[in-house]
Swiss-Prot record:
The keyword Transport applies. GO terms for biological process: iron ion transport; manganese ion transmembrane transport; seed development; seed germination. It is a multi-pass membrane protein. It comes from Arabidopsis thaliana. Residues 1-115, 162-184, 244-262, 309-390 are cytoplasmic. The keyword Protease does not apply. GO terms for cellular component: plant-type vacuole membrane; root hair. This is Putative metal tolerance protein C3. Belongs to the cation diffusion facilitator (CDF) transporter (TC 2.A.4) family.
Length: 411
């Protein structure tokens, strides 16, 4: 997706007849837009505005509005919030100095993330040993499924740890734009392994149901061991999930998702094994099948989510609006028009492409300074990995890049 602005209708201008000769002044524009927006709101919404924090208006609870009206006002509020974020960002970046306290907090956070990964890996080793013993003692296929899950947890944890280490060591001559894409690739491999496990368990459980061969019932001692090991494993995974879920690191959050998944599979596996032992044998493989389906659906979704991030999907309109506003604010009066603002995923973060029109007689030195400062500001945004700013003296031309639909045959 891209946003195109021709000279006849420059961005944020409401006066079409003045568009060719006048570009809107953006200084104080957010305040003006906020005032106009709130002044035009229906009375039923204006009465709910908090004077101290008007942008936190909860439109969803407003009575008497249709759903599409609520959606419209929510989008307008979100746009105003994003513009305010840009203003705050520009103000902070202009005053920014290296803060030793911030650097220390950043180092502490990275250390905490590495600790979370290491604790998760050691916990997976310990739990695998416990579950192997529980499987041998109980003979339950549902517990065996949970044990296989722990085995793959250990393997997948190794993949994520390798991914983390690989991202830290970058040869800029071999990988000139870094190795951030290793992260979604590692998560895809991790999720694919987990989904494969689910399919394998599904086959084994279905085979046991079809063959109609019930497993032997567990005695009192076996049940005690089963309860002790599975409940301990569940408690450990629950603590790890709580510890990891608040992290901002995507790899640590992948660990957190796995820990949450293990809590669910451990509880369901234990319930299925105990009920099968007490009542009907087929409850055990049935529980294993349910776990397998949950595994396949859960991790297949993770595969698709990360795969999409690697194929260049466009940023949503809200992000494009925010970027466009930043371009107009940062560029100053020398930018005649914004021709294109394009943002797309290339891993976790966005790549941004901007085409702007500058005066034809502007000296190269000044034009370069405008483009470079705009690129730097765009790349300072937390959601942007890399920005490309193209300078032109007119915007009436064909697209400068073609989109390939096939791979050339000579490659």
């Amino acid at each position: 997706m891209e946003v195109n602005y021709c000279p006849e209708t420059p961005l944020l201008s409401s006066n079409d007849h003045e568009a060719i000769d006048h570009k809107p002044k953006l200084t104080g524009m957010v305040s003006s837009m906020k005032s106009n927006f709130f002044a035009d709101l229906p009375q039923k919404l204006r009465s709910k505005i908090d004077p101290e924090n008007p942008l936190h208006l909860d439109v969803s609870k407003a009575a008497g509005l249709k759903e599409d009206e609520k959606e419209y006002y929510e989008r307008q509020l979100a746009t105003l919030k994003s513009f305010e974020e840009v203003e705050s960002f520009l103000a902070r970046s202009d005053e920014y100095t290296i803060d030793e306290k911030e650097e220390e907090e950043d180092r502490a956070e990275r250390a905490a993330q590495e600790l979370a990964m290491q604790i998760s890996n050691w916990a997976n080793i310990f739990l695998l040993a416990l579950k192997i013993y529980a499987t041998v003692k109980s003979g339950s296929i549902a517990i065996a499924a949970s044990t296989l899950d722990s085995l793959l947890d250990l393997m997948a944890g190794g993949i994520l740890w390798f991914t983390h280490l690989s991202m830290k060591n970058v040869n800029i001559y071999k990988y000139p734009i870094g190795k951030l894409r290793v992260q979604p690739v590692g998560i895809i491999i991790f999720a694919a392994v987990m989904a494969t496990l689910g399919f394998q368990v599904l086959l084994v459980a279905a085979e046991q149901l079809i063959s109609n061969e019930p497993s032997e019932k567990m005695n009192h001692v076996q049940l005690i061991w089963l309860y002790s090991i599975m409940l301990s494993a569940t408690a450990i995974k629950l603590v790890l999930w709580i510890y990891c879920k608040s992290s901002r690191n995507h790899i640590v959050r992948a660990y957190a998702k796995d820990h949450h998944f293990d809590v669910v599979t451990n509880v369901l596996g234990l319930v299925a094994a105990v009920l099968a032992n007490a009542f009907y044998w087929w409850l055990d493989p049935t529980g294993a099948i349910l776990l397998a389906i949950y595994t396949i659906v859960n991790w297949s979704g993770t595969v698709m989510e990360n795969a999409v991030s690697l194929i260049g999907q466009s940023a949503p309109p809200e992000v494009l609006q925010k970027l466009t506003y930043l371009v107009m604010r940062q560029g100053g009066d020398n930018i005649k028009h914004v021709d294109t603002v394009r943002a797309y995923t290339f891993g976790v973060l966005y790549f941004v492409e901007v085409d702007i029109e500058l005066p034809e007689d502007l000296p190269l030195k000044e034009a370069h300074a405008i483009g470079e400062s705009l690129q730097i500001k765009l790349e300072e945004l937390p959601e942007v990995e890399r920005a490309f700013v193209h300078l032109d003296f007119e915007c009436h031309h064909k697209p400068e890049h073609s989109v390939l639909s096939t791979i050339p045959n000579d490659l």
